Curated annotation (Swiss-Prot):
One of the record's GO molecular function terms: cutinase activity
Domain of life assignment: Eukaryota
Class of enzymatic activity (EC top level): hydrolase
Primary localization: secreted
Annotated catalysed reactions: cutin + H2O = cutin monomers
Protein name in UniProt: Cutinase
Keyword Repeat: no
Gene coding for it: CUTAB1
PANTHER family: CUTINASE 1-RELATED, CUTINASE 2-RELATED
């Protein structure tokens, strides 16, 4: 089971909320849209441990006005108990992520969509994406998952989605990647991958789209 004390012992970092997809105009579509689902107990709709690092790197590469960053919030409350559900998160969270992907495709049908998820947020993405239409899946050019809680169960991939469009980061010693819900210190150490390797992969996917 989850070690809540260890999870909450991580020093507090500023959380972030981003809603450019929700507020952006279809008349000013960006170079890419980045949709991210935070980990359990993280505040805002982006969290602070992973998502903002990747978002900031994409903005540095393309310019802030050329990247819409959108966190999965609302019905996705990122509670701890939802990790124990069969999908590793709630159906409401999955539907909310799907709504955002569909919104991106309808607002900006020619814009490459990228996405990411951390911990429970990785489960949100791995459940949401397979349920999208083929057209929307095709518009998703790259997905990065960190501390993937369904990594073992899903064979190290997003079901029914190209592995060439997916990169999964699992730190040595992060036991959630081995099919458990045991939180070890390694589960909190993805900032480097989020800041460098993940955006590098996403940029390559965007630029080749």
């Amino acid at each position: 089971m989850m070690n809540l004390n260890l999870l909450l012992s991580k020093p507090c970092q500023a959380s972030t909320t981003r809603n450019e997809l929700e507020t952006g105009s279809s008349d000013a579509c960006p170079r890419t849209i980045f949709i991210f689902a935070r980990g359990s107990t993280e505040a805002g709709n982006m969290g602070a441990l992973v998502g903002p690092f990747t978002a900031n790197a994409l903005e540095s590469a393309y310019g802030a006005s050329n990247v819409w960053v959108q966190g999965v919030g609302g019905p996705y409350t990122a509670g701890l108990v939802e990790n124990a559900l069969p999908a590793g998160t709630s159906q409401a969270a999955i539907r909310e992520a799907q709504r955002l992907f569909n919104l991106a495709a309808s607002k900006c049908p020619n814009t490459p969509i990228t996405a990411g998820g951390y911990s429970q947020g990785a489960a949100v993405m791995s459940n949401a994406i397979p349920g999208l239409s083929a057209a929307v899946q095709d518009q998703i050019k790259g997905v990065v998952l960190f501390g993937y809680t369904k990594n073992l169960q899903n064979g190290g991939r997003i079901p029914n989605f190209p592995t060439s469009k997916t990169t999964i980061y699992c730190e040595t010693g992060d036991l959630v990647c081995n099919g458990t819900l045991i939180i070890t210190p390694a589960h909190l150490l993805y900032s480097d991958e989020a800041a460098v390797q993940a955006p590098t992969f996403l940029r390559a996917q965007i630029d080749s789209a």
